[in-house]
Amino acid sequence: KGKSYRTFCPAGPFLYLLDPEDVPLIHDLNLNLWVNGELRQSANSSQLLYKPAETLTELSGLMNFSPGDLILTGTAGGVALKLDKEDMKILSNSVISHEEKIQAFVERQKKNPYLQGGDVIRCEIKSRDGTIDLGVLENKVIRIS
């Protein structure tokens, strides 16, 4: 959902097309993301719960695709949103009102390092052997008042 807001999914201006012999490498890509130089996410595409072929097969049964369509999937661990046992206990408590749950959730999330204006996000995707290297994508978070 969050990737669908305007400006929330920077992509391009280039599209990397794999050579046929490089297609197997999509199952061994290192995915790294830093915020202000601090590594926040580090994973490998081999850890995906649903592989690209499975995802494309399932989605193509539900919708049509056109050349250039961008398919967004999940994310690697390390995002700011965190739910611990206490959070789950609060959210699943049927005695607590919906409004109180939201208030408690928001309050407990304040300690997490969400993005702020001025933060610099840098990400890289490349195969372990270096055959595929998508370069570096760097963006500065701008706060709009």
Regions found by a protein language model. Give the residues of each.
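Glycine-enriched loop-and-adjacent helix/strand subsegments that border the catalytic/binding cleft
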Residues: K1-E58, L62, S94-F105, K110-D119, ...
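Residue-level signal for inorganic ion chemistry
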Residues: A11, G68, I125
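Beta-rich strand-turn-strand
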Residues: L62-L72
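Short, Lys/Arg- and Gly-enriched loop/turn segments at beta-strand edges
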Residues: V79-E86, F105-R108, R128-N139
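Glycine-rich, small/acidic residue-mixed loop/short-helix segments
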Residues: D87, L91-S92
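Low-complexity, intrinsically disordered Gly/Pro/Thr-rich segments
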Residues: G118-R128
